Swiss-Prot record:
Biased composition (Basic and acidic residues): 138-149
PANTHER family found in the cross-reference section: COLLAGEN ALPHA, COLLAGEN TRIPLE HELIX REPEAT
Stretches with biased composition (Pro residues): 28-45
Source organism per UniProt: Ephydatia muelleri (Mueller's freshwater sponge)
UniProt-recorded name of the protein: Short-chain collagen C4
Presence of the UniProt keyword Cell membrane in the record: no
Length: 366
């Protein structure tokens, strides 16, 4: 059993520095046969020895078990302040003792010389708490010791909090196409889009041209091409034709003789004096349409006047009406005995025409 604590002894003189310990052996890296060397078991605690006289610091032994708390001893007499000793090795932290009675403060001792930096030794057994000495100056930092063996794995810590959400990963590859779903109902019609920009101008088109017959003249207007000139002919029998007129060229082509009776016999159209009526085929470039406006002598706005004349027809049977140029229309009469006669105006419901008035006409192109 542990005896009662004795009175505190007087402070002994400072001990001398211990000899430098041998450098510990460290297996690093571990041998190939030992990927991770486990820590060895702790040594058995040694028995607590009787307090001996202060001697030179011995080699530190393993830490013994903590003994039971002893009875509170009587405060000892204050010892003479000792001379400042050289900084010793850090000892293991002892248990907190009872608060002793404050002793009188001793005189400040002289500052001792600065000792050499010693190597850090193993932790010694906790000594008896001595009298508080005058604080010494901080010693120099010791050299960094070699890395010790890895200790046993600690107990798992509590689960940490969820970290902040990381950035989105790259998009994965497209999955296979799913089956075609049923056709949905037609949605409402969207708003009308804006008018698009005007497209580029197209290539210029070719200049058009139109061919027409100028009845009653053998000369085309200025600037137009004379395709051919001739005279007007018609059927000699009202039963053989529909009353249309032809502009037959003055230069006849040679045709082989017919072995059968001809279907249509032609004859010249004459004026009041028995003269043939001329005609000419004209080519008007840059135009595409030719139209005859009856009972008029002026073309509409934007049209070109080809010639002005009189409306004429065959008085013997109904058929084609011609706009005969005024150059030759003055030579036609209104008598029905002629092959071609001008058309006179008769009384109309909406207008008051005189019987002697003729119907004018104008041929226009655009």
């Amino acid at each position: 059993d542990t005896g009662p604590q004795g009175p505190q002894g007087v402070a002994g003189p400072p001990g001398i520095d211990g000899a430098k310990g041998d450098k510990g052996e460290c297996f690093y890296p571990p041998p190939p046969t030992c990927p991770t060397c486990p820590a060895g078991p702790p040594g058995a605690p040694g028995p607590q020895g009787a307090p001996g006289a202060p001697g030179a610091p011995g080699l530190p032994g393993p830490a013994g078990p903590q003994g039971p708390k002893g009875d509170k001893g009587l405060p000892g007499n204050d010892g003479q302040p000792g001379a400042p000793g050289a900084p010793g090795y850090d000892g293991a932290k002892g248990d907190k003792g009872d608060t002793g009675a404050p002793g009188p403060q001793g005189p400040k001792g002289d500052q001792g010389p600065k000792g050499d930096q010693g190597y850090k030794g193993d932790a010694g057994l906790p000594g008896q708490p001595g009298q508080t000495g005058a604080p010494g100056k901080d010693g120099q930092d010791g050299a960094k010791g070699d890395k010790g063996d890895q200790g046993p794995a600690g107990t798992p810590g509590a689960p940490g909090k969820d970290g902040a959400q990381g950035p989105a990963g790259p998009a994965g590859p497209a999955g296979p196409a799913g089956p075609v779903g049923p056709t949905g109902p037609q949605g409402p019609q969207g708003p009308k889009g804006d008018v698009g920009p005007q497209g580029p101008q197209g290539a210029p088109g070719s200049n058009g041209a139109v061919v027409y017959i100028r009845w009653g003249n053998n000369v085309c207007p200025a600037g137009e091409t004379n395709v051919y000139s001739g005279h007007i002919v018609e059927s000699s029998n009202a039963n053989d034709a529909n009353g249309d007129y032809l502009c037959l060229p003055d230069t006849h082509n040679a045709y082989p003789p017919q072995t059968q009776n001809p279907l249509l016999n032609l004859k010249d159209v004459t004026d009041s004096y028995g003269k043939t009526v001329p005609c000419v085929a004209c080519l008007a470039s840059g135009r595409s349409t030719v139209f005859t406006f009856p009972d008029n002598t002026v073309c509409p706005y934007g049209w070109t006047t080809e010639y002005v004349g009189y409306e004429a027809a065959n008085p013997k049977w109904p058929g084609q009406n011609l706009c005969v140029d005024t150059y030759f229309g003055d030579k036609l009469s209104q008598t029905p005995c002629n092959n071609l006669a001008v058309i006179a105006k008769g009384p109309l419901n909406a207008y008051s025409y005189q019987p002697q008035d003729v119907v004018s006409c104008v041929v226009c192109s655009i």
